[in-house]
Curated annotation (Swiss-Prot):
Residues 1-119 form the PH domain. It is an enzyme of class 3 (hydrolase). It catalyses: a 1,2-diacyl-sn-glycero-3-phospho-(1D-myo-inositol-4,5-bisphosphate) + H2O = a 1,2-diacyl-sn-glycero-3-phospho-(1D-myo-inositol 4-phosphate) + phosphate; a 1,2-diacyl-sn-glycero-3-phospho-(1D-myo-inositol-3,4,5-trisphosphate) + H2O = a 1,2-diacyl-sn-glycero-3-phospho-(1D-myo-inositol-3,4-bisphosphate) + phosphate; 1D-myo-inositol 1,3,4,5-tetrakisphosphate + H2O = 1D-myo-inositol 1,3,4-trisphosphate + phosphate; 1D-myo-inositol 1,4,5-trisphosphate + H2O = 1D-myo-inositol 1,4-bisphosphate + phosphate. The keyword Membrane applies. It comes from Mus musculus. A motif (Clathrin box 1) lies at residues 73-77. This is Inositol polyphosphate 5-phosphatase OCRL. Residues 160-201 are annotated as: Disordered. The lineage of its organism: Eukaryota, Metazoa, Chordata, Craniata, Vertebrata. It is found in: Cytoplasmic vesicle, Phagosome membrane; Early endosome membrane; Membrane, Clathrin-coated pit; Cell projection, Cilium, Photoreceptor outer segment. GO terms for cellular component: centriolar satellite; ciliary basal body; clathrin-coated pit; clathrin-coated vesicle; cytosol; early endosome; early endosome membrane; Golgi apparatus. One of its GO terms (molecular function) is inositol phosphate phosphatase activity. The ASH (ASPM-SPD2-Hydin) and RhoGAP (Rho GTPase activating) domains form a single folding module. The ASH domain has an immunoglobulin-like fold, the Rho-GAP domain lacks the catalytic arginine and is catalytically inactive. The ASH-RhoGAP module regulates the majority of the protein-protein interactions currently described. The ASH domain mediates association with membrane-targeting Rab GTPases. The Rho-GAP domain interacts with the endocytic adapter APPL1, which is then displaced by PHETA1 and PHETA2 as endosomes mature.
Length: 900
């Protein structure tokens, strides 16, 4: 069917279809054409008796959109046909069906390009009173702000003074996306992930209706506003949550768990069960699987109420900490976006004997985060427990499955439940006095001395959490298999170590209790039963709110452009040091008339928006009109960036690009000065420094690193001795390693839990500064801090003690001690000296294992990850078998004699 076009019309694109007039379908051809510099849509109908031609000018009032699928949030079956709507200045809205979807989408893409080209040529037009656009414009305008959930009223603005950005979308009939969960409200930069079942958006759809750079932002903004108006479409429905915690002291289950898990007449909807000290064996630190995990998981499943059917939602374990989530089968369909995370707070975060595990999920439309933690032990270590809590909060973040969204931290959830062996004790040294008050049931007097209550009151830990009234006796410490208090020589003071806390609204605790019937461990299990109000979406009301938002956004997007104001654009970070955080803050304000989306974007040819030592928090988000947001610029030099800063290859200099969608870019200048550190400096360079690194000129540091690299290469090739050609003989080992090891040898051989207890952060920074600026007679800080400083030093080395070139040979020779020693003999001299020096020191430490509580397996596992690291290109491909060979390689020298 060859259409006849008006004289002078140049066809650009064409598609055949049907015009829908109620139940009738009439064949037609839609043609995009250009005539006399004006783009037009020509509609030609082919009925039985007539040939009708309509011409619709493509101007600022023209709309041509796809029905239903224009939501951008649903997918379309391949080549299934599509429907479009067309409306112009003088025409009613007309509906067409195009059987060939590919041709339709291509045609719509051409129309969109024509609209954009035409908008560049248009001058303000005199609006005709008969135009549908004019009729819309002269209606009483609602306050956009109220409809979108914002406080500002835009109705008084002079719209003619605003630049128009043509928006070809019309969204009043869109299908709404799944309701956003409220993480978006709590952290505006998070684009909440949708249900796994939800189809994805096609690239073709995105190109048709929104410029590529704006598609995701529009979707995100719609979700953001939906969240703000959440109260309009959700009902609060109560569900029963059972939360339990038990430190099982490495024991296996020896009785039914029903007295703990099935103690309420009505079965709960959700179970959250946490264990600590699940497995105390040395192997638990090094292997992913544990027999105890299987035993206790099965015991929990058998202990759940038989009145209801449950399904395991998630299990997560880190060494001895395990968290299980179960839900009634009829509720599982309402749980989505499940994610797990673990955080070790043992030394350097490598030893997971202490720390936390967590599960986050969305139940209906409420976000939950369940945390199970085991904090530092001993009465006097309450500050370390506080630090463990802060570390878990700071380091534990979740990535929502199958979505590229910013990570969500613990506190960005509607409801957080924190359970576990928190290990806070009573500030009462007299066990007999405590037991006397317990026998008199005067628990309220004891609770005044409870460390957790004291720390919460002082806002040093768990400040924003609630805890129910404790009316049960302390749950620690008992003789195993009995109800008797600890009768060992240590005679531990009873304490409420095992706790359950929560934060969030609509949370009502019904019971908080211990379960004395279970005697497996030296702790008693604890449980709490909650009624939690969960946001359940009313689909009809939700659809109405969604359509309302989209309709108003379509009008607003043509009327306003976004704008930001920054409080400052230049930043200088003075005296930046290794592992010492510096922060600078500034404010951004939305001084425009519409909500806006901002983000830091990579510069040309860069993959990240900033250098590795810099971070902006938040790095993206939404701002409402007149809203102000604080942004923190954080500079932190870690082991990953310290070497290139030490060598002068990089400087504290960067430029950040703050991008405003549909607006302009803002440029932030970052500057500063860095103080070099011995941490992250090569062993060769350190052996050539007789003075502290801060006293060495920067130019000399660069020369030392370059010379050291060349000589190390020669040494590996065994061409020349390491010190040949130098005027000054280098040190046998770096003075920094000698100072740390010598201190530990003199003062820490009898230190309990050496290399297993983290150091204090303030002391670690003092040690780093001390080694960088002086050659001290004594190292500041306690033994644990000095021990961790040694580990940090080894981890930060740009080339590990056993060079990357010999990594694979070490693994291959792990079965043969003779070959292992040959490989070590091929190391460059200073690397070989450091390795032998450390092995001699560790063998000496192992002689005092009865006092310091260390063993060869633990030491081999910890130090093999530092001394025998895989090359960067193999890091992600390291297998458990590789790690086992590395441990075996080190055991050859730990179990050998002093001559080794």
């Amino acid at each position: 069917m060859e259409p006849r076009l008006p004289i002078g019309a140049q066809p650009l694109a064409m598609v055949a279809g049907l015009e829908m007039k109620g139940p009738l379908r009439e064949p037609c051809v839609l043609t995009l054409a250009r005539r006399n510099g004006q783009y037009e849509l020509i509609i030609q109908l082919h009925g039985k008796e007539q040939h009708v031609q309509d011409i619709i000018p493509i101007n600022s009032h023209f709309r041509c959109v796809q029905e239903a699928e224009e939501t951008l949030l649903i997918d379309i079956a391949s080549n299934s046909g599509c429907k479009i709507r067309v409306q112009g200045d003088w025409t009613r809205e007309r509906h067409f069906e195009i059987p060939d979807e590919e041709r339709c989408l291509k045609f719509l893409s051409e129309v969109l390009e024509a609209q954009e080209a035409q908008s560049q040529l248009l001058v303000p037009e005199q609006k005709d009173s008969s135009s549908w656009y004019q009729k819309l414009d002269t209606m009483d305008k609602p306050a956009y702000s109220g409809l979108l959930g914002f406080e500002d009223n835009f109705s008084s603005l002079d719209l003619d003074k605003k630049m128009n950005t043509q928006n070809p979308r019309s969204g009043s009939h869109r299908e709404p996306p799944p309701p956003p969960s409220s993480s978006t409200r709590m952290l505006s930069r998070e684009k909440e992930a949708s249900n796994k079942e939800q189809p994805k958006v096609t690239n073709t759809m995105r190109k048709l209706f929104v410029p590529n750079t704006q598609t995701g932002q529009r979707e995100g903004l719609i979700k953001h506003i939906l969240t703000k108006r959440e109260k309009e479409y959700v009902n609060i429905q109560s569900f029963r949550f059972f939360v339990g915690t038990w430190n099982v002291n490495g024991q296996s289950p020896d009785s039914s768990l029903e007295p703990w898990l099935d103690c309420d007449p009505n079965p709960p909807d959700i179970y959250c069960i946490g264990f600590q000290e699940l497995d105390l064996s040395t192997e638990a630190f090094f292997y992913f699987e544990s027999v105890k995990e299987q035993e206790w998981s099965l015991a929990v499943e058998r202990g759940l109420p038989s009145k209801a059917k449950y399904r395991k939602v998630q299990l997560v374990r880190l060494v001895g900490m395990m968290l299980l989530i179960f839900a009634r089968k009829d509720q599982c369909q309402y749980i989505r976006d499940v994610a797990t995370e673990t955080t070790g707070t043992g030394i350097m975060g490598k030893m997971g004997n202490k720390g936390g595990v967590a599960v986050r999920f969305v139940f209906h439309n409420t976000t939950f985060c369940i945390v199970n933690s085991h904090l530092a032990a001993h009465v006097e270590e309450f500050e370390r427990r506080n630090q463990d809590y802060k570390d878990i909060c700071a380091r534990m973040t979740f990535s929502v499955p199958n979505q590229t969204v910013p990570q969500v931290n613990i506190m960005k959830h509607d409801v957080v439940i924190w359970l576990g062996d928190l290990n806070y004790r009573l500030c009462m040294p007299d066990a007999s006095e405590v037991k006397s008050l317990i026998n008199k049931n005067e628990l309220h007097k004891l609770l005044k001395f409870d460390q957790l209550n004291i720390q919460r009151t002082q806002k040093k830990a768990f400040a924003d959490f609630n805890e129910g009234e404790i009316n049960f006796v302390p749950t620690y410490k008992y003789d195993s298999k009995t109800d008797r208090w600890d009768s060992s020589g240590k005679c531990r003071v009873p304490a409420w170590c095992d706790r359950i806390l929560w934060r969030g609204i609509n949370v009502n605790q019904l019971h908080y209790r211990s379960h004395m019937e279970l005697k497996t461990s030296d702790h008693k299990p604890v449980s709490a039963l909650f009624h939690i109000g969960v946001k359940v979406v009313d689909e009809r009301r939700y659809r109405k709110v969604f359509e309302d938002i989209v309709r108003i956004m379509d009008r607003m997007e043509n009327d306003f452009l976004p704008s930001l104001e920054l409080s400052r654009r230049e930043f200088f970070f003075e005296n930046v040091k290794f592992r010492q955080l510096q922060k600078e803050k500034f404010q951004i304000s939305n001084n425009g008339q519409v909500p806006c989306h901002f983000s830091f974007i990579p510069k040309l040819n860069d993959s990240q928006y900033c250098k590795p030592w810099l971070r902006a928090e938040p790095f993206e988000g939404y701002l409402e009109p007149n809203e102000t947001l604080d942004i923190s610029l954080d500079v932190y030099v870690s082991k990953d960036s310290v070497t290139i800063l030490n060598s002068g290859e990089d400087k504290i200099e960067d430029i950040l690009v703050l991008h405003l969608d549909r607006g302009k870019d803002y440029f932030l200048t970052i500057g500063g000065n860095y103080l070099p550190s011995c941490f992250g400096t090569s062993l060769e360079a350190l052996c050539r420094m007789k003075r502290p690194i801060r006293e060495v000129p920067v130019t000399k540091l660069i020369d030392l690193e370059e010379d050291s690299y060349l000589e190390k290469e020669k040494s590996l090739l065994q061409m020349v001795p390491l010190d040949e050609g130098t005027s000054e003989r280098p040190l046998q080992v770096p003075k920094e390693i000698w100072l740390l090891v010598d201190h530990l040898f003199k003062y820490a051989c009898h230190q309990e839990d050496l290399f297993q207890t983290p150091g204090m952060q303030e002391e670690l920074q003092q040690i780093i500064d001390c080694l960088d600026t002086s050659i001290p007679e004594t190292i500041p800080g306690n033994n644990h801090s000095v021990a961790e400083a040694l580990l940090i030093f080894l981890e930060a080395l740009p080339e590990p003690v056993i060079c990357y070139e010999l990594y694979q040979r070490c693994l291959d020779s792990a079965h043969d001690p003779r070959i292992c020693k040959q490989v070590i003999s091929q190391l460059p001299r200073c690397h070989r000296n450091v390795f032998r020096y450390l092995m001699a020191f560790l063998r000496e430490l192992l002689k005092f294992s009865d006092y310091n509580n260390i063993n060869t397996n633990m030491i081999a596992t910890l130090f093999s990850s530092l001394l025998l690291r895989p090359p960067p290109n193999l890091m992600t491909r390291q297998t458990p078998n590789d790690r086992q060979h590395a441990i075996q390689f080190l055991l050859v020298f730990l179990l050998g004699n002093e001559e080794d």
